[in-house]
């Protein structure tokens, strides 16, 4: 590239390029010859590399001419900008290091999840009533079963019985009670908050006048029965007449339905205990938080009247039922983290147009500090890290941390006096509780030993670790100056005031902070400190401190405005919080750089920034949805725990119940929650009362367990064990089977009692005396219709092992079915062989399907509309932000 320095003209460039190319090829050839003599083994490789190099140089010379001129211009421009961007780059580096440290710290917390995923999960929690019910709730369905003759051959006729829709037992577990617990859990998930039959009604295909039935399953059942050849004519005529009956004056409609009596009881209960309530404008008006309704900065309007059919479901906003802030450090940390991330997303941004120009402010600060005449390194640090991004980050962090009650930790350099002076403002306006104790002590100690004690010529404070008093509390007793002691007294007593507003515990700020008057108190203390002689320190040290105080005191008006702005935004967003704001120090903390506090203090302008009404409504809706879902999931968990207790599954299922509860809250990483907190959560949950609807549903299941067992193809109601083989009996539902339909003449033992007492002696004695014994209780069975396996495997051995090991819960008898559908039926028939078994399965006949008994008329409202987002009816706007009014009827920002 040396030819450029000799002033090559643009038109001569192609010729120059050719000549240079030739020279370079010659030179490179010489080099290759030398290398060949030195290193013969690598000759080919070296040639290839050099030829590639020559080609690449040729391309660079041809194409790079004008690019280099452009790059030179860019270098000149960037050299001018580098000095401006240097502070921003340093800040970015600091931020990166901070994020890395934060991630490392968070990985030690069991329930941590990435920020974006938590925010998405919170916003995705929607009221369950938003999904419409398109079918009635059903456990049973009618099914056609064949009829077998006395010799085991299938007839052409069929018979209808009620069978289970989902006949599934828990995998790998032979306890039927788990089936009922899972069934109850499924009902709780599917239990509708309201039913509108008009939404699910479908056309009855066999109707004479296009009538409708209640849902698609009823229609398909009617269709199957209508087409069955054995159906009576009167039933077909009845199906043809099935249709809805409307009573428009009462807003009522009746629909015909085909339901098992138990399913009918469930759906009748759902219809009679709907959670929907009438909705009108007054309810929507009262739904908006009162402080936002009364805020003069927001204009709210409702332009439409709601119809009489409007309905809504009142959110379940009960408070502190589990007290997760008390002794649930890991869970509480996750809740506060998710609340913090949500709050940060709604705190308004301080954009560059709302802040003072960073460049102009740094220039002004340099003039105030007389930096051109400086010889002291410490004062150049005053300007480090000041930028608009840091100011905005600090503003959002402070408000979001207070809204979520997240503990903050302070990061600072002791030699940066400007940071410490900004920290004095921070400690003045933010209550002490918000900071990690160790971090607060370190910051206070730095302020005392760097600024306060040197000003009065006092010796350095030697603070003892673990001292119940903070450095400021010790200093308050030792400093004689009234203004400084008064300021220290305010900070030492700066706590949140707990106030219950609209039934929610709020953490409110001191009135002196809300109106900004405390800043005058801070300035008086700072002025007193700057007037002191610093007798034990050099003159340069005194000058540095005084100039730092001067920089802050020059912005007295802006600091008052900033404090008022901070308080207003905090209180306005706090009105949208629905869960009690419990204050407990969190396991992890939010890092706050004191340089970012300096940025905020120095760059705050006179523009008022308040949350938009849409942001407030969004924040309120997310909080309501999470809180309501939280309470509903508590109700579910309490109901399941009670059910497990009554089904004698209490010890077995407890941890999985609590895990399911946490999973349904969406924000927890359940596998990483410590076991001690799981069991503590179980203890809290079991102390709560069961919600009425959930208790009634469980009682319905409990009363009808026998009917459900009868309808299952996998659950037996007992087993009969004999020492000698018993013949298989004929049954018209199955053919030849080892089924007993009643227990007449058998000695009976309850399986529950057997499991509880563990006394197997009675069974053994009865079997040895050749007396069959019936073990009564629900247990699963398997079906095996192969005669070969029947010969090969005597099922008595199954029970011999169980009696030996004393494990009734592994009992799983085999049901043998031999009929014309079986593979080996003709083998049995031809040889006239009568199969036998040492066991019989006790099972009652499932309930026959009777059309007349299964036809029910269900009644619901003809029509209503459920609205889940009540705030969508409210149109909202803000007044001119510059005139925004605070609680004391004065402008938030007075400094113009």
Curated annotation (Swiss-Prot):
Q: Name one Pfam family in it.
A: Rota_VP2
Any one GO molecular function term? RNA binding
Q: Mind telling me how this protein is modified after translation?
A: Sumoylated with SUMO1 and SUMO2. Sumoylation of viral proteins seems to have a positive role on viral replication.
Spell out the residue ranges making up region: 5-fold hub: 1-94
Residue numbers for the site described as Interaction with the intermediate capsid protein VP6?
238, 242, 855, 857
Basic and acidic residues composition-biased segments: 9-26
Keywords of the record, alphabetical order, are: Capsid protein, Inner capsid protein, Repeat, RNA-binding, T=2 icosahedral capsid protein, Ubl conjugation, Virion
Secreted listed as a keyword: no
Q: Where in the cell is it found?
A: Virion
Share what the entry says about its subunit structure, partners included. Homodecamer; each decamer is made up of two conformers of VP2, called VP2A and VP2B. Interacts with a VP1-VP3 complex. Interacts with the intermediate capsid protein VP6. Interacts with NSP5. Interacts (via N-terminus) with NSP2.
- Its function? Inner capsid protein that self-assembles to form an icosahedral capsid with a T=2 symmetry, which consists of 120 copies of VP2, with channels at each of its five-fold vertices. This capsid constitutes the innermost concentric layer of the viral mature particle. It encapsidates the polymerase VP1, the capping enzyme VP3 and the genomic dsRNA, thereby defining the core.
Record text about domains: The N-terminus binds RNA. It is necessary for encapsidation of VP1 and VP3. The N-termini of 10 VP2 molecules form a cylindrical hub underneath each 5-fold axis of the inner capsid.
**Which family does the similarity line name?**
Belongs to the rotavirus VP2 family.
Name the UniProt record assigns to this protein:
Inner capsid protein VP2
Q: Name the species this protein comes from.
A: Rotavirus A (strain RVA/Human/United States/P/1974/G3P1A[8]) (RV-A)
